[in-house]
Amino acid sequence: EALHHSAFTVASIMSTTGFSTVDYGQWPMFSQILLVMIMFVGGCAGSTGGGIKVSRIIILVKASLREINSYLHPKSIKKITMEAKPLDNDIIHTTSIYFATFMFLFTVSVMALSFNGMDFITNFTAVAATINNIGPGLELVGPTQNFGIFSLFSKWVLIFHILAGKLELDPLLIL
């Protein structure tokens, strides 16, 4: 039964459905940390699932490994590929800008929510759950709780994150 509940919870978070069969806020901290990490992965490229997207994470990891390799072997030239096709540096740059913008917006929003006096885990996972379109977070916004505890200002911040997660950041930042 525990395997069933944990598999369902992971599938629910990765698919951004927001369903829960158990209060995973009662799980060990290690399991909760893994769930929060899964929140950021989101769907695959082109999906309406929230999160950073698997393809962007792959590009960021490959770009990071290329940079580390260039420090170890300064004269080496390595192209980053996806599906055996080399990626243009503009795509890598755009992905890096997207990730930096995502993390900046995330950090500023967690700080803005901190004015409510809620604990850090509640604020962090509330922003993570909304920008990644997951549904519930942890602590006071866990699967057995709701977002009604936040002030009107904080709710507007979280609404912006729901839109940013569904529509992606680019269209909202252009507006």
Give the predicted meaning of each segment.
Residues 1-175:
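Membrane-proximal intracellular helices of multi-pass ion channels
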